[in-house]
């Protein structure tokens, strides 16, 4: 398996002007062990296709680092100090995965 750092994927996704904030988590996958899921809030709740976000990130990331799915939320939860709440993101992703 390849080592994927969530922060690297998040940084690439945030370069998309429509992406306001995001967190990346791994969820179980039968084929690869884990699949990358991004929980994304958009600038001013804009509507964008998840395929557009993924293809924009493709310019900055190797294929195996790209999220397999984008799950949209109104706000990405963070602690008062701005620290990412990965536990919330993982639960949110599990509850909203297609």
Placement of each model-derived feature along the sequence:
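Alpha-helix boundary/capping detector
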Residues: 39-40, 79, 83, 96
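A short, well-structured catalytic beta-strand-centered motif of the EAL phosphodiesterase domain
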Residues: 85-90
């Amino acid at each position: 398996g390849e080592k994927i750092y969530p922060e690297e994927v998040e940084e690439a996704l945030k370069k998309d002007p429509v992406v306001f904030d995001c967190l990346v988590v791994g969820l179980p996958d039968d084929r690869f062990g884990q699949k990358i899921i991004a929980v994304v809030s958009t600038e001013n709740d804009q509507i964008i296709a998840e395929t557009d976000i993924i293809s924009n990130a493709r310019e900055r990331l190797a294929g195996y680092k790209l999220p397999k799915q984008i799950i949209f939320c109104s706000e990405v939860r963070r602690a008062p100090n701005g620290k990412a709440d990965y536990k919330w993101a993982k639960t949110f992703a599990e509850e909203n995965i297609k």
